[in-house]
Amino acid sequence: MKLTCMMIVAVLFLTAWTFVTADSRNGLEYLFPKAHYEMNPEASKLNKKRDCVAGGHFCGFPKIGGPCCSGWCFFVCA
């Protein structure tokens, strides 16, 4: 019985939350104020590869993206 009441309250809360957040047409405009092309790519930390490992050096377990400058690691950076 308690679980049923909790589920009903949760569904009502989520339904109300959906209606409250969907109320504004410009909600996404304020959430994402600038388009991707308007952003400064130089300010992004994701684009900087200062601390990466050069090709031919040990990088660890095979993975994509890891510490290598190229982004490819198969025990040795590509």
UniProtKB/Swiss-Prot annotation:
One of its GO terms (cellular component) is host cell presynaptic membrane. Transmembrane segments: none annotated. Expressed by the venom duct. Residues 23-48 form a propeptide. Pfam families: Conotoxin. Keywords: Calcium channel impairing toxin, Cleavage on pair of basic residues, Disulfide bond, Ion channel impairing toxin, Knottin, Neurotoxin, Presynaptic neurotoxin, Secreted, Signal, Toxin, Voltage-gated calcium channel impairing toxin. It is found in: Secreted. Disulfide bonds join C52-C69, C59-C73, C68-C77. GO terms for molecular function: calcium channel regulator activity; ion channel inhibitor activity; toxin activity. InterPro entries: Conotoxin, Conotoxin_omega-typ_CS. The keyword NADP does not apply. Residues 1-22 form the signal peptide. Omega-conotoxins act at presynaptic membranes, they bind and block voltage-gated calcium channels (Cav). The presence of a 'disulfide through disulfide knot' structurally defines this protein as a knottin. Belongs to the conotoxin O1 superfamily. This is Omega-conotoxin-like VnMKLT1-0111. It comes from Conus ventricosus.
